[in-house]
Amino acid sequence: METRKYEITYIIRPDIEESAKSELVARFDKILADNGATVVDSADWDTRRFAYQIGKYTEGTYHIVNVTADSDASLNEFDRLAKFSDDILRHMIVKRG
């Protein structure tokens, strides 16, 4: 199967402690790697104010992960677990050219 590039952007709640945020990012990077994806880059982008309130939050820390993967298994697992995480307010997976 062909290797494809993806960009995953997720928003982390702003009131999380720095150590917990680092553990969260490491855990989700590991989920991708354990399911067959290669994490090319994983970094915080910025803490930004939202156009509308998400839950009780008006801002959040955007985190961007660039990955390559041969199948959708790692992305599907990331998507499934991100939906259950209270620390991730929103997430988006985009296939890159």
Swiss-Prot record:
Q: Which residues cross the membrane?
A: none
| Gene Ontology cellular component annotations, sorted alphabetically | cytoplasm; ribonucleoprotein complex; ribosome
Annotated Gene Ontology MF terms?
Answer: small ribosomal subunit rRNA binding; structural constituent of ribosome
- Give the matching SUPFAM superfamilies: Ribosomal protein S6
Q: Please provide an example of a Pfam family that matches this protein in its UniProt record.
A: Ribosomal_S6
Its keywords, alphabetically, are:
Ribonucleoprotein, Ribosomal protein, RNA-binding, rRNA-binding
Q: Which GO terms describe its biological process?
A: translation
Domain of life, per lineage = Bacteria
What family does the database annotate?
Belongs to the bacterial ribosomal protein bS6 family.
Role noted for this protein = Binds together with bS18 to 16S ribosomal RNA.
Sorted alphabetically, which HAMAP family does this protein's record hold?
Ribosomal_bS6
Q: What is this protein called?
A: Small ribosomal subunit protein bS6
Organism, scientific name: Limosilactobacillus fermentum (strain NBRC 3956 / LMG 18251)
Report which gene this protein is encoded by: rpsF
